[in-house]
Amino acid sequence: DKNELAYILRDSDSNTLIVENLKTLQKIRPFCDEIPLQLIILLSDEQPNREDSIKTLNYNQLMELGAKNSLQPINKTRKDLATLIYTSGTTGQPKGAMLTHGNLLHQVRALEAVIQPKVGDRALSILPSWHSYERSGEYFLLSQGCTLTYTSIRNFKTDLKQLKPEHMVGVPRLWDSLYEGIQKQLRSQSPTQQKIVAFFFNISQSFIISRRIAENMSLDHFDAAASERFIARLKATLLAPLHSLGDKLVYQKIRDGLGGKIETLVSGGGSLAKHLDDFYEIINIPVLVGYGLTETSPVTNARTHSHNLRGASGQPIPETEISIVDPHTRQPLPQGKRGLVLIRGPQVMQGYYKKPEATAKAIDPQGWFDSGDLGWITPMNDLVITGRAKDTIVLNNGENIEPQPIEDACIRSPYIDQMMLVGQDQKALGALIVPNLDALQTWGKNQQLTLTFPPQEAPREDIVNSDLYQKPVQDLFKEELKREVKNRPGYRPDDQIKAFELILEPFSVENGMMTQTLKVKRPVVTERYQGMINGMFNS
């Protein structure tokens, strides 16, 4: 977004601008004159405009200049500002989080408690390198002697196979994309092969659930009696040989397709859907989910190999405190009660740049940072995030609905690629759904149906009059939503989705409906489809 970028440049008081290439510079050059820039650096070898009023150097010119000058180290302390990272929030103008050298060094030091990579291990990087999650991950991995390789969405799957990384840092949407790619390959196999794969996945699903209960690592069975854990251990023991056979016949091939050497996927920047947690555990690729925010540098909690409680965001990393309080009174709540998540520790930012009022609102006099997230603490001190306070949907009967867990459950359906719940002040929930057209085509063939779908850019009238809105497809989505919602742990009748609309344009960063870390910008999506949402509840 050019306007957002212009705002950040002005607000940050930057005097130097570093851009990827000449094409990018040409896009933003018109508003550079509004900013007191002294230097522009191109990270390419392209020749800049010599007549530009702002001094511009390409990468080679910068290196030549550096070779002529000796390095003069600058005396900095842990308390000094290291960077401004602007929140790519889902609402409002971005704010510059002031992170110190001490904030970032805490992450390098504390993340050793989460993963212990070996010198020479390879990590594949795909997230924006300016993002706090990626940035702290890079600092940590490089401090451990790892080799870091940057890839892109276009080259990601090829690089994964060729470079064979041991570690990856990513967001849930990335792991979902890998999962969908694997599912697509499995759906293309013969019916017999599909039945064999389904058999082993069902066996392994039972195996991992039993193992979790036996090891007291199940979010749904904290109060399991000794007898229940004994039965679970016995069941896991009996299923282990079949799970191992499935690993040899099926899961090893899947891992080989992902490079074959992955030891750890570190996931952050959003909740990980339960079916993804289950899938990667089944194929023996550990996913360590972490939690944090730009304002906390970012990691505050993380699961580890020795304490990997699926569905949770892990225990606090060293020197970090988590408090759950009542959102209205700010009084601490007992363990197990859901409330507002507050954070205190050496990773918490100094404040928002040039925004003292916003800083005072975010950080109280005792140093507690208001995350804006809702969650609760398990008996083993794991943090479980249930949603954003601002995202809560309040139905007209007064029931509060956290949309994220329900959305995560629904995208387990192979026919749902993306979705966003709506329903503020309505009788029931509704949903905007981006369907998986490939999976729908396969389903149609199995049903002896010839389905034709309009292009993504088709007018709404054409979409509504297409096969997407014919009874068989509509009934399929109704059944999928009903099943996935009801199968979700903690299901309540108010969780049911009574209305939905299908949209063909995916939520993306490019169309402004997702943040850079691939979180849906709910207000933007709501505004864009307000008419459709109104019609959903008026019909």
Descriptions of predicted regions:
Residues 1-61:
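Structural core segment of the AMP-binding/adenylate-forming
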Residues 329-336, 340-395:
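Conserved ATP-binding/catalytic segment of the ANL
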Residues 57, 64-86, 93, 116-122:
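Conserved pre-ATP/AMP-binding loop-to-beta segment of ANL
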Residues 348-349, 382-411, 440-471, 492-494, ...:
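Adenylate-forming
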Residues 418-422, 443, 448, 478-539:
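Conserved C-terminal "lid"/linker of ANL adenylate-forming enzymes
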Residues 82-108:
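Conserved AMP-binding A3 loop
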Residues 105-125, 129-251:
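Conserved AMP-binding/adenylation subdomain of ANL enzymes
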Residues 101, 281-285, 293-311, 326-328, ...:
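Active-site loops of AMP-binding adenylate-forming
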